[in-house]
């Protein structure tokens, strides 16, 4: 087996391919990507058999920015007979590790998603057949590998597997979040998704705790502030625009009509700084770096708006500059970045300061 499939946002295949090429080269696992614009996935073909499995073990999924999911896979199965689609798939999975879950998926395009109704119907008979052949355990298990069947067209699919300690836990790599009817804007889902992706669920009570203070730069009308308020935090909302009255009525929000680049909290008791400003990405990244280095906040989640061209290069440059700034200032940190499902022409970055710094 020498293919890895990576799901991505349609239109970002080139960035996803460039990133996986860089990561594979660093691991000295050589191959090349195959992409088609707006298909929502990338096929990376390794020169050596077995390198696909090595890659999905050695490459931390959490450090891939543009990939929503990755799994090692067979080459594309085509022309599955309508009267028996199961047998060719069972043949393809010979030699796979025994898996604890089956996901029959499609890429995230309108064309492919038309197949989802079929995928749902096909799941039960394929799961039964796989359990009969001991390809799947008798009971679903979140500790065992995940078996992926990805249909890109009727009768055409990739069959592969991922490891649960190094994949996306979500079907199709997409968290299913419901828009809260009382939220002031749909941007609220970006921050909610970021919490799901960047912060382990068992740490939410400690790191997203009631009573904490947060700062939201470029807050109006309050989509990101809403997420902090919902978790019983207090928020400094920074913007020259108008905040949703429903948020102001909670008594948890202090509004400051000032420029987000000039605001400094009077009391340095802030845990979270969040920012979704429409600004040059390098400028936003540097501002977030300053907040953390000065210990004005302990954790940050912010969006970097991407240019029309050279998106991957811009991301690499901004993140590298930010890391170097932290290193230069002697700050220990943890940094993750992801092109989230609810992001468009932007990526979301999370940084956590790991040392006890005094505000200055």
UniProtKB/Swiss-Prot annotation:
Coiled coil (UniProt feature) = none
Any GO MF annotation of the entry: S-adenosylmethionine-dependent methyltransferase activity
Q: Which reaction does it catalyse?
A: cytidine(2498) in 23S rRNA + S-adenosyl-L-methionine = 2'-O-methylcytidine(2498) in 23S rRNA + S-adenosyl-L-homocysteine + H(+)
Keywords (alphabetical) are:
Cytoplasm, Methyltransferase, rRNA processing, S-adenosyl-L-methionine, Transferase
Query: Where is this protein found?
Result: Cytoplasm
Q: Which residues form the signal peptide?
A: none
Active site: residue positions: 305 (proton acceptor)
Positions of S-adenosyl-L-methionine binding: 187, 220-223, 239, 259, 276
Q: What is its EC number?
A: 2.1.1.186
A cellular component annotation (GO) from this entry: cytoplasm
> What processes in GO biological process is this protein linked to?
methylation; rRNA processing
What's this protein's function?
Catalyzes the 2'-O-methylation at nucleotide C2498 in 23S rRNA.
Family annotation (HAMAP family) = 23SrRNA_methyltr_M
Its assembly, as annotated, is: Monomer.
Q: Which family does the entry's similarity section mention?
A: Belongs to the class I-like SAM-binding methyltransferase superfamily. RNA methyltransferase RlmE family. RlmM subfamily.
Query: Under what name is this protein listed?
Result: Ribosomal RNA large subunit methyltransferase M
Upper lineage is: Bacteria, Pseudomonadati, Pseudomonadota, Gammaproteobacteria, Vibrionales
Q: Which gene encodes it?
A: rlmM
């Amino acid at each position: 087996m020498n293919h890895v499939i990576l799901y991505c946002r349609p239109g970002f295949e080139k960035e996803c391919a460039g990133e996986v090429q860089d990561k594979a080269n660093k691991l000295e696992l050589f191959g090349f990507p195959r992409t088609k614009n707006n298909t929502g996935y990338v096929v990376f073909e390794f020169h050596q058999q077995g390198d696909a499995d090595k890659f999905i073990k050695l490459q931390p999924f959490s450090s891939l920015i543009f990939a929503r999911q990755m799994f090692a896979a067979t080459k594309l199965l085509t022309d599955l007979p309508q009267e028996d689609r199961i047998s060719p798939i069972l043949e393809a999975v010979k030699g796979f590790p025994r898996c604890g879950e089956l996901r029959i998926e499609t890429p995230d395009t309108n064309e492919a998603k038309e197949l989802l109704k079929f995928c749902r119907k096909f799941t039960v008979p394929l799961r039964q057949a796989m359990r009969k052949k001991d390809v799947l355990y008798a009971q679903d298990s979140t500790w065992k590998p995940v078996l992926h069947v990805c249909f890109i067209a009727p009768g055409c699919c990739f069959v592969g597997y991922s490891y649960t300690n190094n994949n996306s836990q979500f079907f199709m790599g997409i968290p299913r979040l419901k828009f809260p009817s009382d939220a002031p804007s749909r941007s609220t889902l970006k921050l909610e998704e970021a919490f799901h992706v960047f912060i382990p669920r068992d740490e939410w009570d400690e790191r997203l705790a009631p009573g904490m203070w947060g700062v939201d730069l470029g807050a109006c009308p309050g989509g990101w502030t809403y997420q902090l308020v919902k978790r019983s935090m207090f928020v400094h909302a920074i913007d020259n625009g108008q905040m949703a009255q429903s948020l102001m009525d909670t008594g948890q929000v202090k509004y400051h009509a000032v420029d987000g680049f000039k605001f400094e909290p009077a009391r340095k008791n802030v845990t979270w700084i969040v920012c979704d400003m429409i600004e040059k990405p390098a400028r936003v990244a540097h501002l977030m770096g300053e907040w953390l280095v000065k210990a004005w906040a302990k954790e940050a989640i912010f969006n970097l708006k991407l240019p029309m061209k050279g998106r991957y290069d811009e991301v690499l440059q901004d993140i590298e500059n930010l890391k170097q700034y932290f290193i230069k200032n002697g700050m220990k940190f943890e940094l993750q970045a992801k092109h989230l499902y609810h992001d468009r022409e932007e990526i979301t970055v999370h940084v956590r300061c790991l040392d006890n710094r005094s505000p200055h």
